Structure formats: structure tokens, C-alpha cells
Amino acid sequence: MNIDDLDFRHLVLLDALLKRHSVSAAARELDLPQPTASHGLARLRKALGDPLLVRARDGMEPTPRAEAIAGVVQQLLELRRDLAEGGQTFSPDRLKREFIIAGSDIAHLVVLTALHSAARFEAPHTSYRALTLSGDEMVSALETGHVDIAVGAYPSLVAGIKTQRLYQEEYLCFGKEGHPFIKSGETDDFMAADHIVVSTKGMAHAHRAVERALLDKIHPDRIRIVASSFLVALAACFESDLILTAPARVIGRLAEVYGLRAVRPPILMEAFEVRQYWHARNQDDPPHRWLRQLLHKVLSARM
């Protein structure tokens, strides 16, 4: 068997397999019986002379060859869609696609709820999947098409990556109403308080600068918990007497639900821009452009 024995149905399956890293998940997405998807993967492996997906600790992982061709496969499928539409005007209500959004937990909270609310009538057949990656992984995922858009503050995402400002974010300190620092807002009470710090180490996120500032200025004995998630940190803050320094707009809304109060940090915390990032090859893709425009519209208005 060689590559000439494959048709576009195999490319559709390959695209789903490389995005899902799972035969069963790809079969569900394409509404195929799992044996059919498994047989299709076997044909792809034989035709391309590569395993494509190999077993790993947490499921299956693509081979280097599979990662190298993922973007090409997606481009071929997009070209086929364009040819099938015969130059028709793009209409989101006919769009059937899952978009993959990379970012932190709070970015996903903002983006996924905003997109669901805004798109459920305009594009009822679209869906959205959240993915959390390191900075290096994010660039690669945008390049290969494994991720459609990244949302957050990632200053190092530059080579071949387009970007657009969504909104400005600043920091507040959150804690229980009776906490001495929450009552006073004074530097001495801030330094004397016990803190929970969120770490974004390895994610190339702008929050890293604030994390370093907190670790540099607060005595190590006062750093009681270092968490990897803002949402986990907020829940821990609610269950304790800890102070959490976090982005104001998103965490502030949730803090109200928990009954927490917010005050301005007594030490300088640089504000940052939340942006959306995408690869240049998607710049003129109609579905991708629609997603970016919708995201910009709803977030710049809501935030």
C-alpha cells in the first residue's frame, strides 16, 4: 500500500486522531464505529510507513512524523472545504468545527463561557476544547494546527504568531473580610499575612513577573502554599486565612461568589494585556477569522 491508496476520508480521520490522540475519541467525533477508526489508522500507518500514534503513560502520543504532517493535513482539508463551497460566502451557521483554545484555567473560564454564549445561535454546530500547554508547546501547537488560538499574556510568542489585544488586566489581593490586611490595606499587614502564590512556571505567562515579585518581597515563611491554578488558589483562600494576589477582572467576579473581599496590592504589580494569538497561516481562513472577530467583540465588550 502507498499514499495513493488513501482518500480524503483517511485525511479526515488522521486529522481527528492527531488532535484527539485517541482512536475512540476520534471515532466519536466523526461518528464512526471504533473498529472502523482502528482499521483506518492501520491503513494510514501502512500507507505512510509510520506508527503515527504510539502508546504513552497517559494514552497515545503522535510520532515526530505525525507532528510534522499535522499542519499539512489540516491545510488540505481546508482547501477541500473551500473547493466544495465553490466560492460561496462563509456562513457561521453552516460551520461544523471544534476549535481548540490554549490558555490558563482562568483564560479558559472567560473564553469558553463567552464563546458558548455568543456563538450558540450564530454558529450552533461549533464546539470548543480547552488545552493548557507550556510556552514552547504552545508555539509548536499553533504552528501545527493542534491549537487554533491561545488566549492570555505570553510575551515570548513571537515567531510566525499573530496577536491582538483583548483587554487590560490588573492585580488585586483577595481574602476574608475580617483579615487584618483586608481591613487595613497596609504594607506591614500584607507582609505579616500568610499567602498563597500561583505559579505559572514553564508557561511563559506574564504572571511570572508578579509571581517573582511576591516570592522576592514576602518572607519565605509567609508563603504557605504555591498552587498551579488560580481557581484552586481561590478555593483555598476561601477555606483559610490566606491572601491571594491574582488578576482582578476574572478572579474578582468569582471572589464575590465566595464572599471574599479585594484590596489593592501595597507593592507594585504590573498590569498586563490579555491577547489572542494565532499562527499566520490561519490569518485569512474564514472560520478562523470569524472566531477571532467574535472573541474580540465579546471580550473587549465584557471585560
Curated annotation (Swiss-Prot):
DNA-binding region positions on the chain: 23-42
Q: Does the keyword Transcription apply?
A: yes
Query: Which PROSITE patterns does the entry mention?
Result: HTH_LYSR
Q: In this protein, which residues make up the domain named HTH lysR-type?
A: 6-63
Top-level taxon: Bacteria
Q: Name one GO molecular function term.
A: DNA binding
Q: Does the keyword Coiled coil apply?
A: no
Q: Which InterPro entries match?
A: LysR-type_TF (IPR050389), LysR_subst-bd (IPR005119), Tscrpt_reg_HTH_LysR (IPR000847), WH-like_DNA-bd_sf (IPR036388), WH_DNA-bd_sf (IPR036390)
Listed as disulfide-bonded, the cysteine pairs are: none
UniProt keywords, alphabetically: Activator, DNA-binding, Plasmid, Transcription, Transcription regulation
Role of this protein: Positively regulates the transcription of the linD and linE genes that are involved in gamma-hexachlorocyclohexane (gamma-HCH or lindane) degradation. This degradation pathway allows S.japonicum UT26 to grow on gamma-HCH as the sole source of carbon and energy.
**PANTHER family (UniProt xref):** HTH-TYPE TRANSCRIPTIONAL REGULATOR LEUO-RELATED, TRANSCRIPTIONAL REGULATORY PROTEIN
Q: Which family does it belong to?
A: Belongs to the LysR transcriptional regulatory family.
Q: What is this protein called?
A: HTH-type transcriptional regulator LinR
Please name the taxonomic classification of the source. Answer: Bacteria, Pseudomonadati, Pseudomonadota, Alphaproteobacteria, Sphingomonadales
